[in-house]
Design a protein with these regions (language model features):
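A short, polar/charged loop/turn motif at coil->beta-strand junctions and beta-hairpin connectors
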Residues: 9-12, 79, 156
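Short, solvent-exposed loop/turn elements at beta->coil junctions and helix N-caps
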Residues: 84-86, 149-150
Length: 172
């Protein structure tokens, strides 16, 4: 595994792509849960050009995601901090360069659906996700962003952000 030196001087492993995070039935179930609700049960955020929500239904998948995270991040003390569904569309869709700052030490960005790929950049390297793929990285330490939204007239991208932290960071 390659390691990247962060601006802080700390070394972190390169992000990891997980193909087919969920089996096909679970993936379809998640899509069918969110697609009908996008513009009715979700808040619109014009800063990112997205509809988003953090519904309790995502907790149903926490054990599955947590098992992957513990292996990838080599830690048995991880716990979910929060999950967020985001649907991007239109000319305002964007993700500026940032690091996370809200209990997002470990991040799994899961591509639920997309009209076409919209690469995520993590520490200056592009990662292309297919539907049902995820990229795992250190959200609070690795800069990440997306370039211009492709084909804003027709493009739609659904992502779920699974954020995790260490147990002792949550309770203290």
């Amino acid at each position: 595994m390659l390691h990247v030196r962060l601006a802080s001087g700390r070394m972190r492993p390169d992000p990891v792509i997980v193909n087919n995070l969920f089996d096909i039935n679970q993936h379809s179930e998640i899509i069918n849960t969110f697609l009908p609700l996008i513009k009715t049960d979700h808040v619109y955020d014009s800063n990112f050009g997205r509809y988003y929500s953090s519904p309790d239904i995502l907790n149903k998948y926490s054990d599955h995601v947590l098992a992957h995270a513990k292996k990838i991040f080599n830690s048995n003390t991880l716990v979910p901090s929060y999950f967020l569904f985001s649907h991007y569309e239109g000319k305002e869709a964007s993700l500026f360069k940032h690091i996370d700052d809200n209990a997002c030490t470990y991040t799994i960005d899961y591509c639920l659906y997309q009209s076409e790929p919209w690469d995520i950049f993590i520490e200056d390297k592009a990662y292309t996700l297919n539907e049902n793929d995820a990229v795992c990285f250190y959200g609070e330490e690795q800069f990440h962003w997306r370039e211009s939204f492709p084909n804003p007239e027709s493009q739609k991208v659904g992502m779920i952000f699974f954020h995790l932290n260490h147990f002792f960071n949550i309770v203290n």
